[in-house]
Amino acid sequence: MSDSVHRLAVISLHTSPLAQPGAGDGGGMNVYVAEMVAALAQAGVDCTVFTRRSSVDQATRVQVEPGFDVVHVDAGSIDLPKDDLAEVLDEFTAALAEHPDVEAADAIHAHYWLSGEVGHRLKHDLGIPLAVSFHTLGRVKAGAGDAEPAERISREQRIVQCADALVANAPPERDQLTTLYQADPQRIEIINPGVDHALFSPGSRAGARRATGLGDGPVLLFVGRIQPLKGVDLAIEALARMDRPDAVLVVMGGPSGTEGEAHLREVRRLAADLGVAERVIWQPPMARHVLSTWYRAADVVVVPSRSESFGLVALEAAACGVPVVATAVGGLRTVVVDGVTGLLVPSRTADAFAGAIGSLLADPAHAAALGAEAAVHAREFTWTRAAARLRQAVGELCRGTLVDCR
């Protein structure tokens, strides 16, 4: 085993860092993997990301930049849904075990429980340390009202007990790991994600409105996948409860999961039933350089999620100088400083969100002050800093003794 990290095998089984965030299985984790690996590569760590092939058009190997390659692995049918991916864990693991980039790796960084299971097996086969970022936890989602299979939770528990390091995005995720999974706090590394400040930075709202074709009235923006966890239904209900008939809500995202299309139909019907269908503007996921313009066009970015391990959308909005109104859950409590950079809503109800959003629309000077502070706060979060922390943490694992769960 090496005494430092020069080569890192990154496992992202269920979704590729090359995928468009905001639809299907693409979300904040895609951004995280892509940005973290790019920053590691720029710091001199050779990284290979292994993901399952989900399209016949995907090349077997793609070099994103020097030190950052993506390998698409054949495992199961191309169109296998995420809920069935546990069926291909053996096939995926076997393919990685024979890959020269895995055999040469100093350590493994696995993302999400499916990848964590693969990493757990490879750790023991190869005798190299395993760091795991869960991004979401089954017990947390179940507590927020989302049904999660018992298999996921039991496997998460096993991974927690054997991973050499657990990477938490913020203190609340650390607390969830220790409370819900009895994780050893000494093996938890809190590493805040970053944001690309070259893309996401303050700018002219008037110019952004012209570029997006939005009018002069109040604009609320929701960015994310159309799934119950993200709460677009709550954003629509809040719009309907507000006494601001001049306000519009832009919903930027696409359906996700096996019930995604059905949920999209439900929320569209909800907007019609509440009489605000004409004030909800539906947009597909956008490339990130275009997304930043939509952030700047907004008066408020709304993040009504049931749970979030961090909340990259909230951080991107903050970096653009836009106040965020978010649920007071998980890592959103790290990204949004309540009353300073935005507003946290402790009660996840339409009335509570309508009141918080309405208070900012009624006081543009206060909203502008929050946005300015948000941009300052966001400067604390960079991918260079996050990668340096991760590199240090994994390097220490390489010099230590592996956790043995067998």
List each language-model region with its residue ranges.
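Aromatic "clamp/platform" in nucleotide-sugar-dependent glycosyltransferases that forms part
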Residues: 306
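Nucleotide-activated donor-binding/catalytic signature segment of Leloir-type glycosyltransferases, i.e.
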Residues: 261-286
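Conserved acidic donor-binding segment of nucleotide-sugar-dependent glycosyltransferases
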Residues: 338-339, 343-350, 359-364
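A short, well-ordered alpha-helix in the C-terminal region of glycosyltransferases
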Residues: 359, 366-380
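Conserved donor-binding/catalytic core segment of Leloir-type glycosyltransferases
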Residues: 214-230, 236-239, 250
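Short alpha-helical donor nucleotide-sugar binding micro-motif in glycosyltransferases
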Residues: 285, 293-298
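N-terminal subdomain of nucleotide-sugar transferases
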Residues: 1-72
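Short hydrophobic beta-strand element within catalytic cores of glycosyltransferases
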Residues: 314, 323-326, 336
